[in-house]
């Protein structure tokens, strides 16, 4: 989801649901994105990254209280409303990263991939290779992604690492209604003068300086590796009938020196 307001431009990437819980009929990723989009619209233009993250977390937490789910979600983090964001603060001229969204700053890629993803996607890739060696096919595994099923227990349990530096190098920051440690808020000051920016979700494995080029790179990848376990490793492949493996958000804009 893309947010645009006088103070901020942002990409909000709601996490794929890993439970059957619905929030007013919506899956958790979409519900999280809608909540955070609304909350971003209430932020003061001059607020700091720390203040913004705290307010966004509070907005999610308010949903938990209204739904009377706070106690359950304290002990079952995989059921939470969870999202990653990259936010451009116009007034402070900063990029704020919480999670694994990405950006291009005058052509320079800025991203913070999760170490735990390398482990989990590697496990899925290994499982799929073994399935192929035992007689399965890429088409059959696209129809029934047994690799995704294989890692799903890990995907649920890795939520324990959300905003939890006690998890060592495998912990990762997200907005999920609970406190985000300071070190989980990455701030990138923008240089003076005019800058060209691209903000995007991680649904673009190869981020380019135009939407058309990013889409073309994605199509080429999916044509070569639709299961996404060899050329690019993901936690799920592209299912039949779909045009990609993940939601995608992309916005390109110029920030003037006076902005």
What are these regions (language model features)?
Residues 1-259:
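PP2C/PPM-type serine/threonine phosphatase catalytic domain
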């Amino acid at each position: 989801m893309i947010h645009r307001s006088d103070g901020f431009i942002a990409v909000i990437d709601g996490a794929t649901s890993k439970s059957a819980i619905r929030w007013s009929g919506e899956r958790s990723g979409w519900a999280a994105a809608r909540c955070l989009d609304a909350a971003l619209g209430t932020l003061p233009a001059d607020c700091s990254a720390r203040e913004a993250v705290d307010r966004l977390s509070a907005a999610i937490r308010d949903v938990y209280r209204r739904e009377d789910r706070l106690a359950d979600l304290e002990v079952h983090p995989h059921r939470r409303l969870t999202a990653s964001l990259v936010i451009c603060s116009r007034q402070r001229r900063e990029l704020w990263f919480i999670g694994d969204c990405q950006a291009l700053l005058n052509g320079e890629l800025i991203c913070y991939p999760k170490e735990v993803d390398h482990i989990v996607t590697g496990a899925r890739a290994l499982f799929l290779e073994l399935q192929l060696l035992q007689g399965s096919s890429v088409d059959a595994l696209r129809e029934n992604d047994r690799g995704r099923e294989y890692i799903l227990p890990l995907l649920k349990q890795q939520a324990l690492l959300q905003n939890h530096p006690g998890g060592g190098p495998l912990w990762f920051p997200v907005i999920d209604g609970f406190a985000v440690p300071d070190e989980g808020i990455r701030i990138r000051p923008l240089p003076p003068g005019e800058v060209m920016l691209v903000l995007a979700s991680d649904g673009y494995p190869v981020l380019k300086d135009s939407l058309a080029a990013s889409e073309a790179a994605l199509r080429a990848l999916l044509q070569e590796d639709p299961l996404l376990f060899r050329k690019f490793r993901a936690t799920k492949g592209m299912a039949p009938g779909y045009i990609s493996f993940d939601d995608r958000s992309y916005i390109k804009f110029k920030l003037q020196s006076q902005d």
